Amino acid sequence: MTSDVPNLRFPEFQGEWEKCKVSDLLDFYSTNSLSWDKLEYGTDAIQNLHYGLIHVGLPTIIDLSKDKLPNITNGNTPKNYELCQEGDIAFADASEDTNEVAKAVEFYKLNGKDVICGLHTIHGRDNQQKTVIGYKGYAFSSTAFHHQIRRIAQGTKIYSINSKNFSECYIGIPSKEEQKKIATLLRLIDERIVTQNKIIDKLQSLIKGLQLVNDFVLSCDTLVKK
């Protein structure tokens, strides 16, 4: 099955994208239910992706040479688990906000780390290799995908999905060469945003520092006048 050509596209590519059912694209693996009190940072134990980090703390494309995940504490490693591979996707299966249900991250670079997916996550893998590493994270972050999720998310105060719901969802898949160009561009944009945010944070700290200095000078001036 095919979908229409997107409105914005690299000019060297032509032809329609494949419209692919997510449940046909991904194979799903069991995850664990370890809570935060079973996790810690800074050890050599297996790392665990908690759904809270998908919502806040991790970028769409995870690079473990610079991004940090917690380790499982001693004695709490699950008996059965599936190690994540580069290119694997993890979805958060629950949220109070329908816009955050099925929020996805992709393991772009594991950096030699052993990682498993944990509480309230759905672990998916493209075993057919129809996609390149780095593309799926952005495809599953698209507005088109999340419009589909909002229609099927279940709940009242907490909205949730499961892997079976992905039989009702589709994403567009272009050629691998086009996927690479899309993923590279979006990753560069993400990196630029991170850099700019750091600059903004430093400038805000500088402004606060100058305000403190100004307040101190005014206080001293007031004391001198007294």
Question: Locations of the language-model features?
Answer:
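Residue-level recognition of alpha-helical coiled-coils
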Residues: 205, 211-212, 219
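Extended intrinsically disordered, low-complexity coil regions enriched in Ser, Thr, Gly, Ala
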Residues: 193-208
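Short, flexible turn/loop "capping" segments at secondary-structure junctions
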Residues: 1-3, 114-116, 161-163, 218-221
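Non-catalytic DNA-recognition/assembly elements of restriction-modification systems
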Residues: 8-33, 222-226
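DNA target-recognition domains and sequence-specific DNA-contacting regions of bacterial/archaeal
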Residues: 24-173
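Short, surface-exposed secondary-structure boundary micro-motifs
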Residues: 95, 185-187, 191
